[in-house]
Amino acid sequence: LAELGADTYNIIQVFFETKTKTYAALERLALDSMRMYFSDRCALICITQDMYKRSGSDESETDRIANLPRQIEGVLVGITMRELKDGSYKASVRTHGEIGASSICKRLGGGGHMGAAGCTLYGSKQQAINSLLKEVQAELDSVTID
């Protein structure tokens, strides 16, 4: 595109650096919900339907949020849970190193690959979190962490 005269600066700005106001509001609420587990090796965000309402956002704006928990220094497992309209929870798991996101999610009926995977959880928010944390603990215990 650059060779054809496209304004690459503006393209990058629009596609990679610009956030909608509703996304920024949702991101703030999501980060405020973050909890750390297992000596800060796991960070978990839970986005609720109420957060969508409060931010004016919707599920279409959550893809970039899925990577935020893993970006924190020292975090090996980053989880973003989204409450769906039916009350279930979609979990996106992102991992570093030898920690297998797919191993965590497969045990919960989901799938993916080593560094990124997902699953759907049923029950209350706390039940969903507890199910995820049980599998994260099992995965952390199964690998040697330097």
Say what each PLM segment does:
Residues 1-107, 112-146:
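Hydrophobic helix-and-loop "lid/oligomerization" segment in the mid-to-C-terminal part
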